Amino acid sequence: KGNIVRTIMERYAGLRGYSERKLNVDCVEIDPYLRSILQYEFCGQRMRELSERIRQLDKKKEYDSEIRDYRKLNSVEAAEYRGLKREQEQLRRLDLHIVHDDFHTFQSRKHYDLIAMNPPFADGDAHLLKAIEIQRRSGGMIRCILNAETIRNPYTNRRRFLVKKLQELEAEIKYVEGAFSDSERRTDVEVALIIINIPSPKRESTIFDRLRRAAEVDEPTPNNVT
């Protein structure tokens, strides 16, 4: 229900230079209900509700001619006001787009600093392999939640291939029990948090490569030195 996006927003707000840059987020969500929640929370409607409530509280702070002073919010209203303003500022710095409904068929030429994912447990291995494929092009981070059995019991070729990839990439794996015991879709299954940091590939300029090859061709050899 947008918890991943909300957590990223809060972490991003604490970074240096946050006020100068927008947080660009592309979402891929196959569940129509969850897509509608993302639309509501991050694509306009929530911002309008925040603005209206802030306007109502601001009116309470206007100058009161009867008491010849500015009114003050009570402690509950003041706490609400601070929270609303903080959320409003975070949303102003967020540029979120729902770009696709199926990660398996998702294609993009963008470079993503981070792919954060909570794929369906049934085929989470395929989703994570797709994320690795995307990030290997330009480098980047991956944070993925999988059913722990996907890693601990690699009984299929795809699972075995994934485990091998994770070893090659020196991925960090943390096992967590009861991570979803209090969620709306409750499950007590143990999960694995996969942490992958893929370095950017080294790319040499094609211009320098051509100059180097040209120099090798033109360089005189002992046989033709006079």
What are the residue ranges of the model-derived segments?
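Class I S-adenosyl-L-methionine-dependent methyltransferase catalytic core
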Residues: 1-226
